Regions:
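Beta/coil-rich, acidic/histidine-enriched accessory regions frequently appended to metallopeptidases
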Residues: 314-442
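Zn2+-dependent metallopeptidase catalytic core
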Residues: 39-175, 179-196, 200-212, 414-420
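Bacterial N-terminal signal peptides that target proteins for export
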Residues: 2-11
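Active-site-proximal alpha-helical
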Residues: 269-335, 339-343
Length: 442
């Protein structure tokens, strides 16, 4: 019987999150270019009769402090408005507006090919994503007076620019919305599903405000914090960002494109480098979506929306999970996290196991020999809710045993461990000689 001894760095790392804004996924430029038409002659401006606009009362016009809406709802009736009813199409649950550069039809041959968008396809796919989020996941409860969506449609804004833009959130604590450029719609797929996922995440808190289940909290700087649906960061007084938005928008989009949890290989590559970190760590905000598969397999698909809808400031998602499903027992939470991590070893999740790629199971943990043990390197030391997966070379016959010894927070690293501290891109920032000393026993 071969017997090896292994020191595991059971250390606790407090994760900080630095998303600039909830639901803001990506843009290739810092300032979003807008399509500003040449001022037409007054005689060329057309004004639409709002009484002839189907479902006009289902449109929430964003307040005047929002960019593009400074002149109010009436101005949108003009053909020269940036967002105009003359350049709009709608479906049962969505309005789509496009900028003037597209003309009357964003899919017309007169529009440069790189900027063409099939609006009918966009709306058709958006309706499918709506169905997924409402009927399958339960992110909004419609038809019972519990959601703004009973009386308003979500909003999509298409910008006339080649720079990549994909952002989902909402307006005025009331209605979900997304802003995209044509590249995200060629074809319409998981990117739009991801952004509509953000719109429904936003809708959770908007609906809580609508029903009175949540009340904004005034901050010292005059701003307000919405204490529901993770509309807050995990820093002091709700500062910072919430990587859970991105993790979940990924997972929500994969409900319609299940194979993409593996096909997007850049994400599982990031996961393999960072799974030892906190579940919500910013370094893997687009790649840490496996817990949601385990959660819904164990507790049912409705558990996903429960975490969102029943969250309470200042909880993070796992604290919400612990309260709902573990009777606030930290020991029970850790047992569940162990089960989750064990399933991650081979992606043993019924919903997606069939799509698994061998490259995605290339887990590794850097170890250093130290005093008769193998000690986990600082670069792979598990943070709170993170884990190590250490492959063993099993002989053809016989048994392999291991002795595990936990190390207290702040313990010394192995002598050969350089203690390299890295940033999100893997670049070295500094070095340490001890594991982090933050504890987590309550």
């Amino acid at each position: 019987m071969k017997h090896s001894k292994l020191k595991t760095g059971i250390m606790i790392v407090l994760s900080l999150f630095f998303l600039l804004s909830f639901g803001s996924c990506s843009s290739s430029n810092d300032s979003i270019g807008t399509d500003t038409p040449v001022n037409p002659k007054p005689s060329d401006v057309k004004v639409m009769d709002k009484s002839k606009i189907v479902d006009y009362n289902k449109y929430h016009c964003p307040a005047k402090w929002n960019e593009g809406f400074e002149k109010g709802a009436e101005y949108m009736l003009r053909s020269d408005a940036r967002w105009s009813w003359w350049r709009m199409k709608q479906s049962e649950h969505f309005f789509v507006f496009w900028e003037p550069g597209f003309g009357d039809d964003p899919n017309a041959e007169s529009v440069p090919e790189a900027l063409r968008v099939d609006i009918d396809d966009l709306l058709q796919k958006a309706e499918q994503f709506y169905k997924t989020n409402v009927e399958k996941l339960g992110m909004a409860t419609v038809g019972q007076g519990k959601s703004v969506l009973d009386n308003h449609k979500m909003q999509i804004y298409l910008l006339y620019q080649t720079e990549w833009l994909a952002t989902g959130s909402g307006y005025d604590d009331k209605i979900g919305a997304l802003w995209v450029n044509p590249s995200t719609c060629k074809p319409v797929g998981s990117t739009i599903g991801h952004e509509i996922g953000h719109s429904f995440q936003y809708q959770v808190s908007a609906d809580k405000l609508f029903t009175g289940e949540a009340t904004p909290i005034d901050r010292a700087d005059g701003s307000q914090l919405v204490p529901a649906g993770f509309r807050y960061g995990f820093g002091e007084n709700g500062a910072g960002g919430c990587a859970y938005w991105e993790q979940c928008a990924q997972w929500q989009s994969f409900q319609d494109y299940p194979n993409e949890c593996f096909d997007q290989d850049t994400h599982y590559a990031v996961w393999l480098k960072n799974h030892h970190r906190h579940f919500n760590h910013e370094f893997m905000r687009y790649a840490s979506y496996w817990f949601q598969y385990w959660l819904t397999e164990k507790h049912g698909i409705e558990s996903y929306a429960r975490i969102w809808k029943e969250s309470k400031y200042p909880e993070d998602p796992l604290q919400t999970y612990m309260r709902i499903y573990c009777n606030n027992s930290l020991d029970a939470l850790y047992k569940d996290l162990y089960a989750y991590s064990a399933h991650c070893a081979d992606y043993d999740f019924k919903a997606v196991h069939q799509y698994k790629k061998e490259a995605a199971i290339s887990y590794s943990t850097k170890l250093y020999k130290n005093d008769g043990y193998y000690q986990v390197a600082y670069t792979n030391c598990p943070g709170t809710t993170g884990f190590n997966l250490i492959p063993l070379n099993v002989p053809a016959s016989g048994k392999v045993g291991a002795t595990l010894e936990g190390l207290a927070p702040g313990s010394a690293l192995a002598a050969a461990d350089p203690g390299t501290v890295v940033d999100g891109d893997g670049n070295a920032k500094s070095t340490v000689t001890k594991y982090n000393s933050q504890g987590n026993t309550q």
